[in-house]
From Swiss-Prot:
Protein name: Uncharacterized TPR repeat-containing protein At1g05150
SUPFAM superfamilies according to UniProt: EF-hand (SSF47473), TPR-like (SSF48452)
Protein species of origin: Arabidopsis thaliana (Mouse-ear cress)
Keyword Nucleotide-binding applies: no
Domain EF-hand: 6-41, 600-635
TPR repeats: 234-267, 269-301, 310-343, 344-377, 378-411, 412-445, 447-479
Gene3D superfamilies in the cross-refs: EF-hand, Tetratricopeptide repeat domain
Gene Ontology MF annotations: calcium ion binding
Tagged with keyword Coiled coil: yes
Any coiled-coil regions, as ranges: 773-794
InterPro entries to which the protein is assigned, alphabetical: EF-hand-dom_pair, EF_hand_dom, TPR-like_helical_dom_sf, TPR_rpt
GO cellular component terms given for this protein: endosome; extracellular region; Golgi apparatus; plasma membrane; plasmodesma; trans-Golgi network
Entry keyword set: Coiled coil, Metal-binding, Repeat, TPR repeat
Length: 808
């Protein structure tokens, strides 16, 4: 990392390169030439250039000379604010920094003893603490503050020495290469954004030495409070906080920044720094609140804090992502990129967040822009490759993943995701190589160990797969690992049996057409119904909507009304923007962890919001949304249907009535089918528009709505099968395994009454049967539990014994 001195010299060389008339300022033409020259890969239009220049000259108005343009100090400020990468621009322009230039000022100073003494003191100040302290924008203002900083540095050094001696100071050793992960683009300082490449340090806070340190730190804080003015006290607490932050004493730094907030509530800097501390401490909600206060202060402070807005937006977005609020984070990343078009981290974060909510095309566009601005950005390459893979552009994705790995050979995310891509393509040997490289960087990555086992199994290396599974079991005791080991044992037994007679070269299963699957008994689910219900149940489990009581949806409608707006068609609706909808979902799914909630939002955005926002306006009809999610929420089925009906009543067109229009009812049912049964529903959606006019005056009662809803052919009759899955899909059937996939049967067991083999839910729904049981048709009986199967067996034995008695 460049020192402050070399950094400023580089900026000066760049400034001189484009100050063509040597008047000490960069006019619009000179600035335009600079922007184009440092972005050789970007083809700017005249409109884009003018927009960038307008933004620069407006944001940095205090550094604009009316007759000359942007001054050197102004250009330095733009780089300090993260608007560009000094090192990258310097290299792109082919400039060189002479070593002698940094020492000229020192030699000139020797001509005057008094000046020499003064400059020597300043130089010592610069050397004894971090570069931020001497920054003209955010540095130390009062001389007394320097004394506090000096004393604090001594205290920290003493604490570090004692804890290192006692072996109490711990670095984060969970992995061997922290820098191998995709960075968050975290703007740590009120200056240039920088990646956190050093390891996290954990201080032993319960030790006696730490207690003494905190006590002595309290004395320094008291000195800061006893300053001659409020401004000097603020300066002292900010400096103390920043020194503590640099040494990763985040809890203590937070105390200082909070005190600085009390002294100057309208200053952006302490709120920003407090937000950073809270985020590092894992308190994302409190971090978000501090950044919102910083944003409020910056927006009300006029141009004084305008240059900080992009970084506040970026860190606010990161804090929101920490809560799982990815749609909201996208909004702030987008704002940062608009304010600062060369902010490559904002563009990368925007692309990554868009990928996280399933908007892959938009993600690719943002990530490609980030890479144009920073071609060696490994993390952007990694997420771009993941987006391309999600769009089906696998060969290009492999190339981009490889580029990310070339840029950063130990990049865990790129290696792991490339392994997953190779698995999807059936290239198991290459996949196992990628997972092996992940484990080289991060030895206790249990998912990589498990996936390595699966890829080795796919490559036919059963013994190696078994060893890899055992290694994974040492790292975690998750139940799926036990199932996988059991699965391997069954495969080995089957392989041993087949060595004698074989299957005639056939695969592990054959797929039978649906008409050949017959059911025995009224309770046995039809194969097509189960296949559809399994897909809906999978969506329900990913979104965790089953954890949301449907009464909470009713309460949300009652307590938080949505203002009426008018859509493009002119009809009144209660619609809100997607980020606001995300806030409502966060309340409904408040028990979810952030990463789980993020997965839920992605699934809902892809499956539901994409259809509800078919115009691409970014707004969603909330009445229709509540009605669509109600059938999958928790609670009795009758309550779910009632809430769905009430949600349609809540829409402006039906409000105040006890009945809904038939248009709404038909549209809802067809939308429900289009979302959850897409193979049937999409064509039906096209018919709705032609029916609206004729049915707009016809109303539907709740009982009529129920009849429409429960219709097995034209309604959502599949819900009865979904309810059965909800009740039984965690049931285990003892030692019973599926005859096709060889995994333990979980959920219902489907037993073929003639051949007597058993299938799990998934294989039955997909129509898979063992190749050794070829029949003209298959008759299945469904058992929801093993107790039910035993009961049926006892009844069968009883009937047989009666028959024998009669025969004799």
């Amino acid at each position: 990392m460049a020192t402050r001195g070399s950094r400023s010299e580089k900026v000066k060389r760049i400034f001189q390169q484009f100050d063509g008339n040597h008047d000490g300022g960069l006019n619009r033409e000179e600035m335009a030439a600079l922007v184009v020259a440092v972005n050789p890969r970007v083809k700017f239009s005249d409109e884009q250039i003018n927009a960038i220049l307008d933004e620069v000259f407006r944001t940095y108005a205090e550094f604009i000379d009316p007759n000359k343009g942007l001054t050197y100090d102004g250009l330095l400020r733009t780089y300090d604010d993260g608007a560009g990468d000094v090192d990258r621009d310097f290299d792109a322009l082919g400039l060189e920094l002479n070593a002698d230039e940094t020492t000229i000022k020192g030699s000139e100073a020797a001509s005057s003893s008094s000046i020499t003494d003064e400059r020597a003191v300043e130089a010592q100040k610069k050397q004894r603490t971090a570069a931020w302290a001497v920054s003209p924008n955010h540095g130390i203002v009062f001389d007394e503050t320097w004394k506090l900083v000096d004393d604090l540095e001594i205290l920290v050094k003493r604490l570090k020495s004692k804890q290192e001696k006692d072996g109490k100071l711990k670095a984060d050793n969970n992995n061997n290469n922290v820098d191998a992960f995709s960075d968050a683009g975290w703007s740590r300082e009120l200056g240039p954004s920088s990646e956190i490449s050093e390891k996290r340090i954990y201080w032993e806070e319960s030790s006696h030495d730490y207690g003494v340190f905190v006590k002595e730190l309290g004395v320094l804080r008291s000195k800061a409070d006893g300053a001659r003015s409020r401004e000097e006290a603020f300066d002292g607490h900010m400096a103390i906080g920043r020194v503590l932050y640099e040494h990763q004493l985040f809890k203590e730094a937070l105390v200082s920044f909070k005190r600085a907030c009390e002294l100057q509530p309208t200053d952006v800097r302490p709120h920003f720094k407090a937000g950073n501390c809270l985020y590092v401490l894992g308190k994302c909600k409190e971090s978000k609140d501090e950044f919102l206060l910083a944003l409020e202060a910056a927006e009300s402070g006029g141009n004084q804090w305008a240059y900080l807005l992009p970084q506040i937006y970026v860190n606010l977005g990161i804090a929101l992502e920490g809560e799982g609020m990815v749609l909201s984070a996208c909004e702030y990343y987008r704002e940062a990129a608009i304010l600062c078009p060369t902010h490559f981290r904002a563009l990368k974060l925007l692309g990554s967040a868009l990928f996280g909510v399933g908007e892959y095309r938009a993600a690719v566009k943002a990530l490609e822009e980030a890479i144009y601005l920073k071609p060696d950005y490994a993390d952007a390459h990694c997420d771009l490759a993941s987006s391309l893979h999600s769009m089906g552009e696998d060969e290009r994705a492999i190339e981009v993943f490889q580029r990310a790995i070339d840029l950063k050979p130990g990049h865990v995310d790129a290696l792991y995701n490339l392994g997953g891509l190779y698995m999807d393509l059936g290239r198991f040997q290459r996949a196992s190589e990628m997972y092996t490289r992940v484990l080289t960087v991060w030895p206790n990555h249990w998912r990589a160990q498990l996936n390595k086992a699966v890829s080795l199994l796919g490559a036919g290396e059963t013994e190696e797969a078994k060893r890899a599974l055992k290694e994974a079991l040492k790292l975690t005791n998750r139940v799926e690992l036990h199932d996988a080991i059991s699965h391997l044992k069954h495969l080995q037994k089957k392989k041993g049996k087949n060595n004698g007679n074989g299957n005639g070269g056939e695969g592990p299963f054959i797929v039978v057409e649906p008409s050949k699957f017959k059911t025995v008994g009224e309770k046995t689910t039809l194969r097509p119904d189960l296949a559809t219900a399994l897909q809906i149940r999978a969506f329900q489990r990913v979104t965790r909507l089953g954890k949301c009581d449907v009464e909470a949806v009713r309460k949300e409608m009652r307590d938080n009304d949505v203002p009426v707006s008018y859509s493009g068609s002119g009809g009144p609706t209660k619609s809100i923007r997607k980020p606001n909808l995300e806030e409502i979902l966060r309340r409904l799914l408040s028990s979810l962890k952030p990463d789980t909630f993020q997965g839920a939002i992605k699934a809902i955005n892809e499956k539901i919001l994409a259809l509800l926002d078919d115009s691409g306006s970014g707004r969603v009809d909330m009445g229709m949304f509540y009605a669509v999610i109600a059938p999958l929420c928790g609670g009795h089925s009758d309550k779910r249907k009632r809430v769905a009906f009430d949600a349609l009543l809540w829409r402006p067109v039906n409000e105040g009535s006890s009945q809904i229009t038939k248009t709404d009812a038909v549209k809802y049912i067809k939308l429900l089918r289009a979302i959850y049964i897409p193979s049937h529903g999409m064509s039906e959606m096209l018919e709705v528009h032609g029916e609206e006019e004729a049915e707009s005056s016809v109303t539907v009662t709740f009982n009529q709505f129920l009849a429409m809803f429960d219709d097995p052919d034209w309604g959502f009759g599949i819900m009865s099968t979904i309810l059965k899955l909800e009740a039984n899909d965690r049931n285990r059937h003892g030692n019973q395994v599926c005859s096709v996939c060889r995994y333990p049967v979980i959920g219902s067991r489907f037993k073929e009454v003639k051949a007597r083999f058993s299938l799990c839910n998934q294989c039955y729904g997909e129509g898979k049967v063992p190749p050794s049981f070829k029949q003209e048709e298959y008759k299945f009986r469904e058992y929801e539990s093993e107790a039910e199967a035993m009961k049926a067996k006892c009844v069968c034995f009883s009937m047989q014994s009666h028959k024998k008695a009669i025969a004799t």
